[in-house]
């Protein structure tokens, strides 16, 4: 994103007739929050003097630190294109700070910045290209979201079959107006499912843009009378929505993952091995919802086992060669419910842990894993991903690297809140149970 000085922002605000400023930040679970201030308070806000009471925000603030401060990142300043042209609205993404101007330890953005600074000291820069999938559903007569769509389009279909094409195009034009580089978009496999892909960018900018992207997509969809959802598996009978991450690691401007003859390098293999070694413990962050695990099942093009491959695109980690760009690693398990700051921090730290230890990757998957029986997987020592949120939370607490990267306080609070969510789910009496047992028992 373009870097702005304070004086430049004040000038733009005056020239563009901006009247409101949104001070946005991300909570520990990846939800975008904001405080709106009138333009008369802009200078005060830019001097980090916007206090927020976080006592009612689950898990974010400790009892002794319920009042914190928002520190705008000037590089994230943008005017929101979908707001009225009279009385425009702009926004900053903010870091959360304590009264003594320290960045707050439970701030997800701080956790990623800390990981990036650590990598930078070793000469590394992480670049990421996310592929974000979502559904566009109809709303009911009261404007509430449904899982209904009259569309029957499939992979790469176009209009008039793809009924969401105009919405998707408007989303992209809006994002480009906000400084995004969009490399492609298309209809996905399931009816009413869409994908928009970003260009490679540094990890912090990517995480910031993912947060803004979700807000923009939902806002533009609403203009068309549609509800955009990033829920991983809103319908049982079709593919779910993920957020595949393409990653490359640079050192002195060179792609570390690309070795001789354009193949995966030794350090690239070690980075890959580091992620595979910790992915079970990181899954509660990559896939943070009860619903996330209904996507990670065989038969719907989502990974359910800890595998890597150059040729099998259903593997958890796919090694991809791009013409003229070298090798990148595609991680296929995360979904858009994940907090992108935590997601990228964990990927980077786990990968660098692999490089530091010069780890070797497990045996490469060279055939379709769907053809392997459970016994064959066991013989090949292929580990499964957690199959529910409860198992994932247990694994999270047992992974020392996850606890080190996120911090013990963060992990404890995250587990507490998510276990409450998991327990609440387990206590529900579902429609399936009633259909199966009410008549028979």
Across the structure, where does each feature detected by a protein language model lie?
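Glycine-rich, acidic/polar active-site loops that bind/position phosphate-bearing ligands
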Residues: 1-441
